[in-house]
Each structure stands twice: as C-alpha cells, then as structure tokens.
Design a protein with these regions (language model features):
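Flexible "arm" and connector segments at domain edges
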Residues: 1-103
Length: 103
C-alpha cells in the first residue's frame, strides 16, 4: 500500500468514526458534504494565513511555521474527504494530478 492509499484509508476510518460515511451518498448528501468540507477548509486557510506575518500595520509578528504545518495537515484532511465524497480513489487523484501537471 502506498502512502496516499494509506492516507485515504485513515481518512475514511476517521470520517466513519465521526459519523460520515461517504459510501453510497445521495447527490444531495454529496453536495452538502462538499460544501461542509469546503467551508471547513476556508476556516483552516484563515488559520494558516494567521500563521504568517501578513498584517503590514502590526509591528511584532512572527512566522509560526509549526502551526502552519498543522494547518496544512488539517486542510489535507478535508481535501481528502472531498475527494472521497466525490468517489475519487488515490489512483484517480494521482492520475488527475499528473495529467494537470502536463499542461
């Protein structure tokens, strides 16, 4: 099993533990969960932004690299969940990613 497959398996198990089963979702549920996860990603992105000194008007800011790494992983959790809601496998993600990089 490769690392991406393991991540997908771990995310599937986590989602099921918290009550989200992506197997056989209706179109309505898929739309709901894509929106839920996208909103969650917006929040995580805001937290990532707050990890960097972006406030040009504030004097004492530091780059919190450790927190930035945590937020990247949080974003990845939700991104993998969206892929799963859409029925994408690790291979589907890999294929789409490599195809997009050929552009």
């Amino acid at each position: 099993m490769d690392k991406l497959e393991e991540i997908f398996d771990l995310q599937d198990a986590l989602n099921k533990r918290i009550g989200v089963n992506t197997d056989g979702m209706s179109e309505e549920d898929k739309a709901k969960w894509v929106l839920n996860y996208t909103r969650a990603m917006q929040q995580e992105m805001a937290e990532l932004i707050d990890s960097v000194p972006w406030k040009w008007w504030a004097k004492y800011q530091e780059f919190d690299e450790q927190n930035a790494k945590v937020e990247v992983v949080d974003l990845f959790h939700f991104l993998v969940s969206i892929a799963q809601v859409l029925g994408m496998t690790p291979q589907d993600v890999y294929d789409a990613y490599t195809k997009k990089n050929k552009v």
